[in-house]
Amino acid sequence: MSTNKITFLTNWEATPYHLPIFLAQTRGYYEREGIEVAILEPTNPSDVTALIGSGKVDMGLKAMIHTLAAKARGYPVTSFGSLLNEPFTGLITLKGNGINDFKDIKGKRIGYVGEFGKIQLDDLCSKFGLSPSDYTAIRCGMNIAPAIINGEIDGGIGIECMQQVELERWCVSQGRPRSDVQMLRIDRLANLGCCCFCTILYIAHDEFIAKHPDKIKAFLRAIHSATLDMLKDPVQTYKEYIHFKREMGSELHREQFERCFAYFSHDISNVPRDWNKVTNYSKRLGIIPQDFEPNCTNGYLTWELDPDEKDPMGKQEAIAEIQDEIKQKGGVFSGNSLRYVEPANL
């Protein structure tokens, strides 16, 4: 085996927002940087932090809240960059299912992806005068949208650019308007000020980072090049992604990519403000101890980073407007490449 080989585990099966990872492969950026990256997909997304944290895989992707929890549970992992920033996440349901505000979950069947989704739901129950016994929790994994469609649950925790799009497309196929899909955003319900707990991160085993800093930097340079290519020409780079991953050519995946586009990190950096918010939120949920320090670094990024966002709440509102316009008019495949800010290095 080449000593320059890196094993990389995605957070679940190939999705539209994995494009930069595969594009860096197809455009030869890993090879240019002198590394060979074996891209792996998990059969169970819940195994990702354990596999990386045990050293069986070098690096991969995971959401921020899972990355914090993994370190608190003894898995030595650290985030060294971000892929998808603050995708809107919340309780998704269909009009007519009887859930118009959070209190309406009483007596309902509510789906969640994994362990921390249940913890978040129970925390919100205490905020809204409910108890965990007031609703039926059903673990659905990544299949929130099909579970709603099949009537197995009345609503479930999902991401706007993924599960919500899947449910919207089903509504259209049934002659129903997209507006029949509703989301109660967790950041608003919990007064977080951001949806950063579901930011998708690049993470690695601490020992791998310590022993191979040059590999981390090389990987990031390759990913940065691929990310900038994607932001400059999303249509062409997505065509290349389809050539590598045929399933990405479906109308569902193309639309999910359009809705992911505004969330892509431009400079791949960890955002300290977001990490502080999610760390404090995780402490409140009891996921990590009170003395926990964020397990992230920007020390391996070798380019100028974007300036700190001066109005993060304003950014959230602007992105919400962008996402609504894309939902109504189409995104990059309709010539609409809206995103919140222009990348600094384009």
From Swiss-Prot:
Compartments in which it is found:
Cytoplasm; Nucleus
The reply to whether ATP-binding figures as a keyword in the UniProt entry is: no
The UniProt disruption phenotype note reads: Auxotroph for thiamine.
| The protein's enzyme class | transferase
**Record flagged with keyword Transferase:** yes
Stretches assigned to coiled coil? none
Q: Which GO terms describe its molecular function?
A: 4-amino-5-hydroxymethyl-2-methylpyrimidine phosphate synthase activity from histidine and PLP; metal ion binding
Regions crossing the membrane: none
Q: How does it assemble?
A: Homodimer.
By its UniProt entry, which CDD domains does this protein fall under?
PBP2_THI5
The record's catalysed reaction(s) read:
N(6)-(pyridoxal phosphate)-L-lysyl-[4-amino-5-hydroxymethyl-2-methylpyrimidine phosphate synthase] + L-histidyl-[4-amino-5-hydroxymethyl-2-methylpyrimidine phosphate synthase] + 2 Fe(3+) + 4 H2O = L-lysyl-[4-amino-5-hydroxymethyl-2-methylpyrimidine phosphate synthase] + (2S)-2-amino-5-hydroxy-4-oxopentanoyl-[4-amino-5-hydroxymethyl-2-methylpyrimidine phosphate synthase] + 4-amino-2-methyl-5-(phosphooxymethyl)pyrimidine + 3-oxopropanoate + 2 Fe(2+) + 2 H(+)
The annotated pathway is:
Cofactor biosynthesis; thiamine diphosphate biosynthesis
Q: What is its EC number?
A: 2.-.-.-
- InterPro entries, alphabetized: NMT1/THI5 (IPR027939), SsuA/THI5 (IPR015168)
| Name of the featured protein | 4-amino-5-hydroxymethyl-2-methylpyrimidine phosphate synthase
Q: Origin organism of this chain?
A: Schizosaccharomyces pombe (strain 972 / ATCC 24843)
For the biological process aspect of GO, one term held by this record is:
thiamine diphosphate biosynthetic process
* A cellular component term, taken from the record's GO annotations: nucleus
Inducing stimuli = Repressed by thiamine.
Give the UniProt keywords, A-Z: Cytoplasm, Iron, Metal-binding, Nucleus, Pyridoxal phosphate, Thiamine biosynthesis, Transferase
Cofactor(s) required, per the database record: Fe cation
Top-level taxon in the UniProt lineage? Eukaryota
Q: Which residues carry this modification: N6-(pyridoxal phosphate)lysine?
A: K62
CCCFC, short sequence motif: residues: 194-198
